[in-house]
Amino acid sequence: MDSEYYSGDQSDDGGATPVQDERDSGSDGEDDVNEQHSGSDTGSVERHSENETSDREDGLPKGHHVTDSENDEPLNLNASDSESEELHRQKDSDSESEERAEPPASDSENEDVNQHGSDSESEETRKLPGSDSENEELLNGHASDSENEDVGKHPASDSEIEELQKSPASDSETEDALKPQISDSESEEPPRHQASDSENEEPPKPRMSDSESEELPKPQVSDSESEEPPRHQASDSENEELPKPRISDSESEDPPRHQASDSENEELPKPRISDSESEDPPRNQASDSENEELPKPRVSDSESEGPQKGPASDSETEDASRHKQKPESDDDSDRENKGEDTEMQNDSFHSDSHMDRKKFHSSDSEEEEHKKQKMDSDEDEKEGEEEKVAKRKAAVLSDSEDEEKASAKKSRVVSDADDSDSDAVSDKSGKREKTIASDSEEEAGKELSDKKNEEKDLFGSDSESGNEEENLIADIFGESGDEEEEEFTGFNQEDLEEEKGETQVKEAEDSDSDDNIKRGKHMDFLSDFEMMLQRKKSMSGKRRRNRDGGTFISDADDVVSAMIVKMNEAAEEDRQLNNQKKPALKKLTLLPAVVMHLKKQDLKETFIDSGVMSAIKEWLSPLPDRSLPALKIREELLKILQELPSVSQETLKHSGIGRAVMYLYKHPKESRSNKDMAGKLINEWSRPIFGLTSNYKGMTREEREQRDLEQMPQRRRMNSTGGQTPRRDLEKVLTGEEKALRPGDPGFCARARVPMPSNKDYVVRPKWNVEMESSRFQATSKKGISRLDKQMRKFTDIRKKSRSAHAVKISIEGNKMPL
């Protein structure tokens, strides 16, 4: 990098045209590269120098640069470098020494002197040193770049000095030529930019000014320092006076001014400067450089392009590769076009700078073409190659002008289209939201109505819901019409009332039947699950899988179906025999075989699916003469029913087993044990209907206690009747408030009295009043005992036992006698 900076690629910071001129005297190829790089960077820097000279004319540079000198003590190093370089330059050129009379003054102020001292050289050295020294404090990267640029510049100035020594006339001549142009640019700040453009910058410079302010605000700290880096660096440098003075410079040097000054129409940049100044000096920069930095995506585009363009735009900080790229004027112009396109896009976002920048770009490219033509005329005398490069750049710039205008127009059109599109989209979205909201409301209403209809179809109307449980109970267990029969008291009324609301849902969930369910519009649609259920029902009586799983047991199905047929036949024969007034013994004779099969665990589900419940109902039902079946039959079948797995409500409903069991439960002549079994069966079968659970494992302790409290019967307190002797309060008697009855007193009883029965139910455990300190202490002490202590205690205990086991020696003297 240093070699490249010293080789002349660093000419960007060292003052574009002087480096070019020196290189003109030195090397033409380097001059081309330096033209483009130094033109781009020093163009911006020269803008600063020219702007700052014009600022000096305006009186701005002093305060602004004084702030630089105040802020830039490190800059003083650079300033000293630029001053030493300027001293060399003073030795090299009297015209430079004349302006160095100013530079020292501006050197103390900071690097305005350097700006004017070496015009484009010391201007960039000064600005870059000034800005770079500022950047050195804040932006080491850019400061290092700017320092390297300063070094490059100063070294460039040194190399320029060497080249000046080689061709002092060329330096002074170029500076003199620059001075006239600078004077022109001083008289005309836009020409100043043009002068800087004509001096250094071919098209790259305006864009370099923009792209540098965007990309290398820091490298261009010379340019973008006054524009943004003053902000970045000046704000970073703790003194935003610098940025603001430099912003005052940047006000005269605004990127718009780069372009504005580059643009022949200085009024546009000035209005824009006025806009940017009225907005804020930062906003001047913000308009171009800052805005393009702030939209750093775009600035990054311009910067990323800039580095690539960068050779054009970032000739200062960009590597020699970029400097090498700069000589490639076509690539540079294209990249600069991209940079300016991105800038124009950024400006299109900033409508203030948009129109001006379009004009600036057009005027820039035009003026740059004129400047390049001027440079070509000057350089034609010096270099034919520079002339070719300038023409090439002019042509590229003319192309880039068209591209920039097109891009600016596109950006405007795009921004307008974006606004209109966004408005239209917002309107459309609003309409869509409204339509969607209305549609969703209608759909919600339809869904609610459909849900209500479905609920009515499933559960019936609300008026029916209250009676649904009763209807289901009546279907399963029959009507309770016989008053003389015993009432079922299996449930507490609270349980039934609390769980009535859940009954319908539980019913629907537990029931397998599709009865009373009107599918409505879903009539044609059957889910896979429903189809599977239908297949299962159709296959239910035919094939069964063994629980072990595996093989089909068709023989078991045959046995089960044959047994059920026999049971139904036996029940029918018994009814016929009963009608004939004959003993009905068919069921009794078949009972052992039925019990044997029904007790087989692997056949229970098969029996249930095959319809054994209806056969059992036939067996438990009373005979035609209203007599109960044999007691043995009732006992065995009730036991088997208890052992059967859970039975679905549909099976209970269709088989009628519930009615038969309820009949037995209520029958006055049924045995107590059978009634208990029947009550348990009814309780178990009806629990799912009322949503009650019989699983107490899932209940917490609090829930169980609450359940016990709720189910606890409310006993009436036993009050003394009027005919009995009023019971005396023993506590009052014992405390002496009332005298104990003596013999002969009314109410005295000369016998021991049985204590009153307590009507208290101890459900809640009484509070434990005994302190637990001792137990806690023991627990803690036990925890504190180590294994060693335990072993020692065991050892001592064993020794004591072993000693006591031996015969005790009695001491005649009475020694070791326990007292």
UniProtKB/Swiss-Prot annotation:
Coiled coil region boundaries: none
Q: In what ranges is there compositional bias, type Basic and acidic residues?
A: 44-68, 85-102, 189-210, 228-275, 319-328, 349-376, 425-436, 443-459, 699-710
Q: Where is this region: 3 X approximate tandem repeats?
A: 235-296
Q: Which GO terms describe its cellular component?
A: nucleoplasm; nucleus
Sorted keywords for this record are: Acetylation, mRNA processing, mRNA splicing, mRNA transport, Nucleus, Phosphoprotein, Repeat, Transcription, Transcription regulation, Transport
**Consequence of mutating residue 477 to A?**
Loss of interaction with PSIP1
Places the protein is found: Nucleus
Q: Where is the composition biased (Acidic residues)?
A: 377-386, 480-500
Name the Gene3D superfamilies on file: Conserved domain common to transcription factors TFIIS, elongin A, CRSP70 (1.20.930.10)
Q: Which InterPro entries match?
A: RNAPII_TF_IWS1, TFIIS/LEDGF_dom_sf, TFIIS_N
Task: Give the free-text PTM comment from the record.
Answer: Phosphorylation increases its interaction with PSIP1.
Name the predominant localization: nucleus
Modification type Phosphoserine: residues: 27, 54, 69, 157, 159, 183, 196, 198, 209, 235, 237, 248, 250, 261, 263, 274, 276, 287, 289, 300, 302, 304, 313, 315, 329, 333, 351, 362-363, 365, 377, 398, 400, 415, 420, 422, 426, 438, 440, 461, 463, 465, 480, 511, 513
Region (Disordered) location = 1-520, 696-728
Q: Which PROSITE patterns match?
A: TFIIS_N (PS51319)
Q: Where is this motif: Integrase domain-binding motif (IBM)?
A: 469-495
Modification type N-acetylmethionine: residues = 1
Q: Which residues carry this modification: Phosphothreonine?
A: 435, 489, 725
One Gene Ontology term of the biological-process aspect is: in utero embryonic development
Q: What domain of life?
A: Eukaryota
Give the record's family classification: Belongs to the IWS1 family.
How it assembles, according to the record, is: Interacts with SUPT6H; binds preferentially to the POLR2A-bound SUPT6H. Interacts with ALYREF/THOC4, SETD2 and PRMT5. Interacts with HDGFRP2. Interacts (via IBM motif) with PSIP1 (via IBD domain); phosphorylation increases its affinity for PSIP1.
Q: What does this protein do?
A: Transcription factor which plays a key role in defining the composition of the RNA polymerase II (RNAPII) elongation complex and in modulating the production of mature mRNA transcripts. Acts as an assembly factor to recruit various factors to the RNAPII elongation complex and is recruited to the complex via binding to the transcription elongation factor SUPT6H bound to the C-terminal domain (CTD) of the RNAPII subunit RPB1 (POLR2A).
What is the name of this protein?
Protein IWS1 homolog
Q: Which organism is it from?
A: Homo sapiens
Show the taxonomic lineage: Eukaryota, Metazoa, Chordata, Craniata, Vertebrata
